[in-house]
């Protein structure tokens, strides 16, 4: 087959006309150094703070330092195989995690990927991990309770929906136990829970997940894990990821509770990243913005008003407020609450539950110190019956502690002082509670009623908890309607007071404890 010159030129023209050039603009850079999970990238223009940078092998790094001729980024995952000269690409996106009800009952990592072996999560939505907190106009005052199930907390240091209540104390004195019991107590309350484990041993986290499952609370809970073996970047980001998952419920008129266990380890991870990025260190070698690290996280816990929810859902949800309640945990060293991170978080939160080593070792568990524990807003959210009955509990305990200190120096005490000491001892004994045994509103109200009205005065100290158990068992059997009414409404009036008095008198007459 022979082609003449005209046909050849026509064929070439045809090919040129049909040729399509597909060009793609890529923001590319080159790795110039790798050390301890920090990479420096040259040539990556137009990158923003917190942008995800795609690395070879489907991994990502987070841009944190934007310098004149390079970008400092922290690798989210293993980095041993990264080398100088490798090409990286800017994505133009900031980190987002999957959110929604599909995550309930699952254990995920910081990026929202399942790590519980129960298959993929079919989440329909994602949300940025860094979000600006709701403004002043969008918020509503806290006036609904979060029942933790602990007598000592719900009576003296009440927590409201949308509050930030710090749990602070030394290691191994029950901080996590208190938070986990609070989550277990929400299984029938309509409050969704998020538990964020930061820098903990994998075995400890597995035990927490097992306990939540055993007590039927895992189905309403999302567990976010950044264990001690994870990179510092993932430990630093885990609380923000968990918060984004909680905000999904808050912004749709639901209530959620989030536990950060613990923010001390997050601050240490952030300090590690900052020092490796050569940011100037400050007090205790923490960077200058460690306060902002926690304030921008905890300010996202709030109660938002009906207008905010309606606007956010485009009118789909009307007349409902939403809330995200935060229980951050801080570990102190030898009870030093004046260290840098503890004082920061105390100043950000709406109160603190202080757990004391001396009380824990003395067998008072939960080891809540009522003297320096406080709730700045929860009082207005307290259940009515608990608020009415528990007014004297804190006073009795404070007076008992003060008198007990003086009583050590004096043997001849007057009758009034002896009576006050005896009452204080019994109230302290009554505040003890076993782990994984949260109490209902009725159980707490009846126990406090018995203590406040002097029904424990003739009960021996070592029989106080037996008396309580027998009283509650009797009440649930003989006064089931009253128990159901108080659990449902939390109301208190003269009629309920008379019924509680009759109940306790009837029980005392049986002498069965």
Swiss-Prot record:
Annotated family: Belongs to the ATPase alpha/beta chains family.
Q: Which gene encodes it?
A: atpA
Q: How does it assemble?
A: F-type ATPases have 2 components, CF(1) - the catalytic core - and CF(0) - the membrane proton channel. CF(1) has five subunits: alpha(3), beta(3), gamma(1), delta(1), epsilon(1). CF(0) has three main subunits: a(1), b(2) and c(9-12). The alpha and beta chains form an alternating ring which encloses part of the gamma chain. CF(1) is attached to CF(0) by a central stalk formed by the gamma and epsilon chains, while a peripheral stalk is formed by the delta and b chains.
One Pfam family recorded for the sequence: ATP-synt_ab_C
Does the entry feature the keyword ATP-binding, yes or no? yes
Q: How does it sit in the membrane?
A: Peripheral membrane protein
Function statement: Produces ATP from ADP in the presence of a proton gradient across the membrane. The alpha chain is a regulatory subunit.
Annotated catalysed reactions: ATP + H2O + 4 H(+)(in) = ADP + phosphate + 5 H(+)(out)
Keywords, sorted A to Z: ATP synthesis, ATP-binding, Cell inner membrane, Cell membrane, CF(1), Hydrogen ion transport, Ion transport, Membrane, Nucleotide-binding, Translocase, Transport
Which GO terms of the cellular component aspect does the record hold? Answer: plasma membrane; proton-transporting ATP synthase complex
* Annotated organism of origin: Vibrio alginolyticus
Residues noted as binding ATP in the record, renumbered to the chain: 169-176
**UniProt GO molecular function:** ADP binding; ATP binding; proton-transporting ATP synthase activity, rotational mechanism
The places in or outside the cell where this protein is found are: Cell inner membrane
Site (Required for activity) location in chain: 373
Q: Could you tell me the EC number(s) of this protein?
A: 7.1.2.2
Q: What is its main location?
A: membrane
Question: What superkingdom does the record give?
Answer: Bacteria
- Identify this protein by name: ATP synthase subunit alpha
